Amino acid sequence: MKQLVLETTKILAEVSEGIGWLTFNQPERRNAISLEMWQGIGDAMEMMEADADVRVVIMKGAGGKAFASGADISEFDQRRANAAQRHEYAQISVRGSQWLARFSKPLIAMIDGYCIGGGLAIALNADIRFATPGSRLGIPAARLGLGYEYPGLAALARLVGPSTARDMLFSARLLEADEALRVGLVNFIVSQESILKDVLVYAERIASNAPLTVKAAKAAVNAYEKYSQIEAASAIADLVDACFDSEDYKEGRRAFAEKR
């Protein structure tokens, strides 16, 4: 396993056999995301984007109680006490958010415990979300009196629909795992005992597939969500061409012809 060197120990990043691991490592605060951690997220995602050996990335929280419980509110009095400070805070945190949003390889969120506020915003950047039965997901911004940034709101509404998004935002309630599955907020519910194994098996399946095809598929779905049909088709045309010119496609045709 290859360890990626970051300027913080609150974000851990590793690569092993085509799979990247990003761990939120502040369990004493239920992995609340500090500004230092946002910097680490951006650094780690940039490294894993550039690493051709990385086919898929798994995000998880340390400690077994939370994926991430939102922003580290203990910093707010010093770093985010008013609108002016919010903009300064955003200038630093936005790099991590942007890398999560534009990461070209599949992202998997392994949710075990609380996934709240900014933690849910991180999970919404994942392409696939696994959760344990005891997990709780929600956005309690209305209880704290703070504004939730547009990208997170838009991602939530696209995923669960405007009606459910309004319910979650207005009530500030936390969804249990079975409701999160029903509304489409998570893809799979698996036991706490098996989640690491189940997520790893799923990631290995992705890593074994043709990377250009997987990349093009992710780009196509993302374009479908964000653009008009004409803009979406244009955005992925080059990626589709790259698939047809790849060695994976040639080998796939040979394997099919030879019935392998």
Residue ranges and their predicted role:
Residues 22, 26, 40-41, 59, ...:
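Terminal peptide-recognition signature
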Residues 1-60, 98:
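Conserved CoA-thioester-binding segment of acyl-CoA-metabolizing enzymes
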Residues 61-98, 145, 227-228:
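Glycine- (often His-adjacent) and acidic-residue-rich active-site loop
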Residues 98-211, 246, 251, 258:
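Crotonase-fold acyl-CoA enzyme core
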Residues 1-17, 52, 64, 172-178, ...:
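C-terminal alpha-helix plus adjacent terminal tail
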Residues 27, 51, 79, 103, ...:
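Generic structural signal for alpha-helix termini and adjacent loop/cap motifs
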